[in-house]
Design a protein with these regions (language model features):
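Clamp-loader machinery-focused feature within the broader ASCE/P-loop NTPase space
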Residues: 1-119
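Short glycine-/polar-rich loops that comprise or flank the Walker A/P-loop
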Residues: 27-31, 103-105, 131-135, 145, ...
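Conserved catalytic/switch belt of AAA+ P-loop NTPases
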Residues: 97, 122-136
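Structural recognition of the conserved hydrophobic beta-strand(s) that form the central parallel beta-sheet
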Residues: 107-111, 124, 135-142
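Short regulatory helix/loop adjacent to the ATP-binding pocket of P-loop NTPases
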Residues: 119-128, 144-151
């Protein structure tokens, strides 16, 4: 994802030094969006990934390799079920309907898409099949779930 936004990429990787690379390293590039399972907050009727974005960034900075129990602990919601709710699909559609702030790709990283509820996945199907120009979806499914889907 960083490579696509790099202002000075080489043949193998992003430069790591341009303003876009620095923003990607901080997980704060305006055209980089994350979607991941969340636990509904009691204070909010509809919870979306952005509500937990600081915790997400912190965990990713600590370790790029983690699982759902580690994520639940980072959110402070152990022993609760995390899902990607239908409101998230509205947020994805809204974010991707905007122009790229840097003039390049809009990148949507969806971690554990298998945790989407049915309503959410149905609303996103058309968008995934025919994304807007210069839009990239990266879906990162858990290995076990992906293996089951292949059978």
């Amino acid at each position: 994802a960083r490579y696509l936004s790099c202002q000075n990429p080489n043949d193998e990787d992003a430069c790591g030094k341009c303003p876009n690379c620095v923003k990607f390293d901080k997980l704060a590039h305006p055209d980089l969006h994350f979607v991941f399972p969340v636990v509904k907050k009691k204070s909010s009727k509809e919870t979306v990934s952005d509500d937990y974005l600081p915790e997400w960034r912190e965990l990713l900075k600590e370790t790029p390799y983690f699982n759902l129990p580690m994520w639940l602990q980072a959110m402070g919601t152990e022993n609760q079920q995390a899902l990607i709710y239908v409101k998230e699909s509205d947020e994805i559609i809204r974010k991707l309907s905007l122009k790229s702030s840097q003039g390049g790709y809009k990148i949507m990283i969806i971690w554990m898409p298998e945790k989407m509820n049915t309503e959410c996945s149905n609303k996103l199907l058309k968008l995934l099949e025919e994304p807007p120009a210069q839009t990239l979806f990266l879906l990162n499914a858990m290995y076990i779930a992906a293996k089951k889907m292949m059978k």
